[in-house]
């Protein structure tokens, strides 16, 4: 009997080995972006999905279809051939696909962008009803559907083309002053430089004077003879640019600037409008980034509101506002403000009808706040509100994305504004990318998880109607010999905080062998490398290295994203120190596994991960045999003002912290082999931060 059991076991093992051998091996062409087979190994997707009110639209390559949200029934609206014939008849250019079209109105109209025009097509009559010329060099385009006015920049100045096609030059500034573009190095949630009022009657914009900022030499190699094109690069502790906010009126062609006082060493962010277009709201921050104020200004005169600031928040470390206020669509006397004041980013409802005398209140981990309006916290818990998708006016709910299910996930919730009760929208599992319909009654839910290659569904936000499936993708890597990928937790260096890790074992793993290992690291703020996503976010390179026989480990250390304020700001004034301690705990975990060759452990990362890689090689030289650091910061004194000073203060006020994070001072500690990769024209981590008087790092 025992012989029979042993024979069966051998047969099973043999068949398993044969099955694994029958599967394909990956090449770099399969796994690297841009590879010949890379896109074939991505799960199937529907790229052109969007909303036209409560009707789902699939704007694909050759045609545009409507999809009924209740039953999934499809109808063709228009074809690519029909659109290009209409454009050709008016000599308005052509399009190659429908991926860039939109449906801005309740009426059956589609907005098309060619290289030279914006075009509105009446889909009932199938005719062009309006067009607006575009400058071929227009950048930072911002179109308002109500006024049909287009704001854009040419070089460093701002222009507006109105609905009748007439162009107005808003600013005429010399080189060194930039208008209508993103400011403050894209920090504080800033992604653009123009902000239309709700009806498009007024345009708020940034004006940034950077003439006083030091030039950093960059070389344009695209010209026949290379030319010098310096960047303005404000470094930590040095002079920064000055930003003001203008309000332009296309009807009068006049501009007023907000009377916010001297802009020196101040940040202006999260610009928003009141629904009646009479007021502009701005969150203002001091250069130390530890005191934020919500202020309101008269849009016609630029004068500040008498009871400014409406809200202010301070912290002994830093405050980082990233979201503009949002008014309730059914009650314009109330707006939602986002804050981490209780330790996690949450929603707070402020009532402008109930002015109160501002009093200071204690907040989480050394913070405090003062309110001029009665405020009610809408969401609460040890999880993060990631963003607001919109509202359902009928049910009086705000639709959000949050990490309530897990720090490894992003899920949609409906939050009742009156009671604060929350309702999960859609499948509980996975990472969800969600688009809300015009009324807030439906979402397009595109989600993946470790076990779900991709599902796309139309989901009612009420939870009472049936879900309509648009796509259930199969696993395109099914035919390949995949490594085993697992996720778990280990304790941080503080002995109490759980850290998530991702472990990838080599293909055809043998527990009796000793394998080399690579730690892939980022470790900085606003980044998270592990999610309940496809392959737990493992990159193609990780999988390829596992195929070559490497154990791959990634740890999201303290200081990274989506775990709350104290998890992130424990690194304040000492970037790299606590993060490295946590990464060493990851190495200790590797060593405990029994199948890792402790003398062959490497480390690799890009950007902040490049800084971490270099730092780990120099601080713990006995742990790492080899490292590859891409685009690292070598000395934080040479990094940009906004990011660097938030986490490190200035070199003048924190000399010890900057000294400890200056990797040039510890270059002599290197024992292993370290490759450092840097772009000679890198605008973010500049080459000169490596250089010393007597040579190169």
Outline where the language-model segments fall:
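Bacterial Sec-dependent N-terminal signal peptides
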Residues: 1-24
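Beta-propeller folds
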Residues: 20-425, 429-430, 441-442, 452, ...
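Generic alpha-helical secondary structure signal
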Residues: 8, 26, 303-305, 373, ...
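Extended hydrophobic/Leu-rich segments
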Residues: 8-10, 83, 196, 273, ...
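Short N-terminal micro-motifs specific to bacterial/archaeal maturation
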Residues: 11, 22, 149-150, 236, ...
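Serine-hydrolase catalytic core recognition
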Residues: 215, 277, 355, 431-697
